[in-house]
Every structure is written in C-alpha cells, then in structure tokens.
Amino acid sequence: MKWTFKNGKLVTIKADKNIEVFKKYFEKISGEKDRIGRFIIGLNPEIKPQTIFDMMALGAVSIAVGYNKDIGGRNEATAHHEVTISNATVKIDRETIIENGKIKL
C-alpha cells in the first residue's frame, strides 16, 4: 500500500489489491479521517515483526490517519486506520529518510 500526504493530509491511496474494500470502509468514516494521527519509526532490534509490538521493531514504520485524541492529539474522527509496514520506505519532501527499513539520516 502507498499513501501520499500533503500538508499532513492523506491525498492518495494506492494498493496492489483490495483497494476498493479499503475505500468503501474509508468513505464511511467522518471527521478528520485524512489527517496524520500517529507516525512511529521502529527502533528496537529485540522486537520481531508479526507481534503485538511490531510497530516498534527495527525497520518498521507505523502510520495512522484519523482519530488520535486518545493519545493527546487533536484529530476528531469516527475512527482511525493504522498500517504497520516492515522494511518500509519513507520519503519526506522527496528525501528518503528510511529505505527498506534502514534509517538514512
């Protein structure tokens, strides 16, 4: 899945499969569903992917959009959606900061 953000808002969603299912789910959410709610870079080499803590595993990236008041945020929405990706690539302003799970900074 590829999410593209501009000014903190989700502007495009692409996926190889099941994109229509996700879009139907996403359309039903109201409020600030397209605002970044959480962004986590996993730094812990002791945590393995596919566990309850996989968002903290070294090389993982977790990003959520929508509701985040439960963690001190300001986004008001009827839900939030979070994706955790192992060996992720993250670009900010066209600069790659994480490539295949390796921090480039």
Where are these regions (language model features)?
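Metal/cofactor-centered catalytic core regions of large enzymes
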Residues: 1-105
